[in-house]
């Protein structure tokens, strides 16, 4: 199954970290956040990636062209450094397609730009490239496959520290509660789409605006609510939180389940983690 990652954003609210690299290349630990996302998808069998490049796209190309497996894997060093034997690898069987989609393009334009690379696919996966989750992907895909929807998106509850204030007509406050304790759901940036999505995107349109509204009007947009772990990386505070998690439980690292049976996760049994038929369409 193909996975489209939108990698063209500049990360304006992460200035200082994203001055020299695109937002998806900002590191969590020793690897960029997009690497963590790709490991997540690969864990479930989806290892064919299409990267929608934009702002400083050459940084992403250079990273993979000079990828150093030793940074995140065990290895044996011998003969004074003349021999380095990797004991395991991150992406032996990954396929990555790099597509320039424009420095200032929006998500809808980037998606249209890669349409030729997903022709023939019935469905595909897509992701904003700046958020991590441990959502059980096969469950989300199974629900989508059984529906007549053209697209499905992950809904999560906001992780903001803001409070909701309920005030009466005269201004007297009736209740204050954390936004996380409300029935508010936001777009989590994880998508599954059928190829028909491209017929609903006109030139210049932002994906979640006009195209998704057309799907809503046709009752063809499916929501998958998930109240487990999800965290975006929009601000310095978000990055700091992800760094702290990376030092400990790192809930999004579902791939650790395969290496350590003692790790608790939301993964289905191995036999259910087969690659599923999901497709992405694009247009360069």
Which residues are covered by each model-predicted region?
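Short coil/turn segments at beta-strand junctions that form active-site/ligand-binding loops
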Residues: 1, 47, 120-123, 219
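N-terminal glycine-rich phosphate-binding loop and ensuing alpha1 helix
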Residues: 1-67, 73, 98, 273-284
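Structural beta-sheet core signal
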Residues: 3-5, 51, 126, 151-154, ...
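A structural signal for short hydrophobic beta-strand segments in well-ordered beta-sheet cores
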Residues: 25, 164-167, 223
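Well-ordered alpha-helical segments embedded in enzymatic catalytic cores
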Residues: 33-36, 109-113, 211
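Conserved beta-loop-beta/alpha segment of the NTase-like Rossmann-fold superfamily
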Residues: 60-168
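Catalytic-core segments of class I nucleotidyltransferases/pyrophosphorylases
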Residues: 122-125, 132-145, 156-160, 172-267, ...
């Amino acid at each position: 199954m193909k996975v489209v990652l939108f990698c063209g954003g500049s990360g304006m609210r992460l200035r200082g970290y994203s001055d020299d690299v695109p937002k998806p290349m900002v590191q969590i630990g020793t690897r960029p956040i997009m690497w963590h996302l790709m490991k997540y998808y690969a864990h479930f069998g989806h290892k064919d990636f299409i990267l929608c490049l934009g702002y400083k796209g050459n940084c992403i190309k250079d990273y993979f062209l000079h990828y150093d497996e030793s940074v995140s894997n065990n290895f044996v060093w011998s003969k004074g450094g003349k021999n380095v034997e990797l004991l395991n690898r991150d992406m032996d069987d990954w396929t990555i397609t790099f597509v320039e989609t424009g420095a200032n393009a929006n998500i809808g334009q980037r998606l249209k730009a890669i349409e030729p690379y997903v022709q023939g696919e019935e469905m595909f996966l897509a992701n904003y490239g700046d958020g991590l989750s441990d959502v059980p992907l096969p469950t989300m895909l199974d629900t989508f496959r059984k529906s007549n929807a053209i697209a499905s998106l992950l809904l999560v509850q906001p992780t903001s520290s803001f409070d909701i204030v309920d005030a009466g007509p005269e201004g007297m406050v009736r209740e204050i509660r954390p936004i996380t304790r409300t029935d508010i759901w936001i777009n989590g940036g994880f998508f599954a789409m059928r190829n028909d999505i491209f017929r609903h995107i006109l030139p210049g349109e932002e994906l979640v605006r006009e195209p998704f509204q057309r799907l809503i009007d046709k009752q063809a947009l499916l929501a998958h609510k998930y109240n487990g772990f999800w965290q975006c990386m929009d601000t310095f505070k978000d990055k700091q939180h992800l760094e702290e998690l990376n030092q400990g439980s790192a809930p999004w690292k579902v791939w650790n389940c395969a290496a350590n049976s003692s790790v608790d996760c939301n993964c289905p049994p191995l036999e259910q983690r087969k690659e599923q038929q999901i497709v992405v369409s694009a247009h360069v």
